[in-house]
Amino acid sequence: MIALGCDHGGFVLMREIIKCLDERNLPYKNFGTFSEDSCDYPAIAEPISRAVAAGEFEKGILICGTGIGMSIAANKIPGIRAALCSDSFSAEMARQHNDANILVLGARVIGTGLALYILDTFLKTPFEGGRHARRVAMLGDLENCR
């Protein structure tokens, strides 16, 4: 199951992503926001990131204007490996090599078509494991240094 959320800057793109998920019969929970009214991205990123980190959701998708704020906020939560992706190769590598568990998109940076292509790549690409598993474990060790 996918946890999905956006701030006001990502609302229009999130509606398109919801259509895509519905067409594919992919289960998700929409954490909001539910309008284009201004809201604070950390308030959206935190519950989604905590739910993904707790294992309640397999993956998450966060959307804001640039993706930067959501990415920073999500990566504050231990266990989260949020990747801001503006191309499909980055999404593929984020999954294959970094076991990214949250995809972050910048709605004002990329168009809908590219966003859906990135989403497809992120969702279908498995984690490669092997030497990359060791590196992901090292990221977890860094979280414990706080």
Task: Indicate residue ranges for each PLM-predicted region.
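Helix-adjacent hinge/juxtasegments
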Residues: 47-84
